[in-house]
Amino acid sequence: MKLEILESFENKYPNRDYTIEIVNPEFTSVCPITGLPDFGTITIRYVPNQRCVELKSLKYYFFEFRNAGIFYENITNKVLDDMVALLEPRSISVITEWKARGGITETVSVHYTSQS
């Protein structure tokens, strides 16, 4: 989960508020307690400022989680923190929706709004 993997490009419309939504329905990680794989959908929704995330780099960033033992809540917050560091967006939300484990599903959401 290296921030250095992520790349961005210049937003050609920085004076316009518009929303970018990215959905990865095949997100995987590993439960740090059981070592079993976790499967989920991750959605990133943001209003860009000066930069936009480059999707191929985001795909490789997501691959970094495949073998990582990490809790759902930590994944969601880590992705938000890394995206804020990379993009400095006007606002951003990260939502993770996890497949049932033992009959229980979980959804974690976190939001950031720029103070400027």
Swiss-Prot record:
Record's subcellular location: Cytoplasm
InterPro entries with a match to the protein in the record: GTP-CH-I_C/QueF, NADPH_dep_7-cyano-7-deazaG_red, QueF, QueF_type1
Known catalytic reactions: 7-aminomethyl-7-carbaguanine + 2 NADP(+) = 7-cyano-7-deazaguanine + 2 NADPH + 3 H(+)
Function: Catalyzes the NADPH-dependent reduction of 7-cyano-7-deazaguanine (preQ0) to 7-aminomethyl-7-deazaguanine (preQ1).
A cellular component term, taken from the record's GO annotations: cytoplasm
Matches recorded under Gene3D superfamilies: 3.30.1130.10
Keyword Acetylation belongs to the record: no
Pfam families in UniProt: QueF (PF14489)
Annotated disulfide bonds: none
Active site (UniProt): C31, D38
Pathway: tRNA modification; tRNA-queuosine biosynthesis
Full protein name: NADPH-dependent 7-cyano-7-deazaguanine reductase
Family affiliation: Belongs to the GTP cyclohydrolase I family. QueF type 1 subfamily.
One Gene Ontology term from the biological process aspect of the record: queuosine biosynthetic process
Binding-site list for substrate: V53, E54, L55, Y72, E73
MF-aspect GO terms: preQ1 synthase activity
Species the sequence originates in: Chlorobium chlorochromatii (strain CaD3)
HAMAP family found in the cross-reference section: QueF_type1
Enzyme class per UniProt: oxidoreductase
Keyword set, alphabetical order: Cytoplasm, NADP, Oxidoreductase, Queuosine biosynthesis
EC annotation from Swiss-Prot or TrEMBL: 1.7.1.13
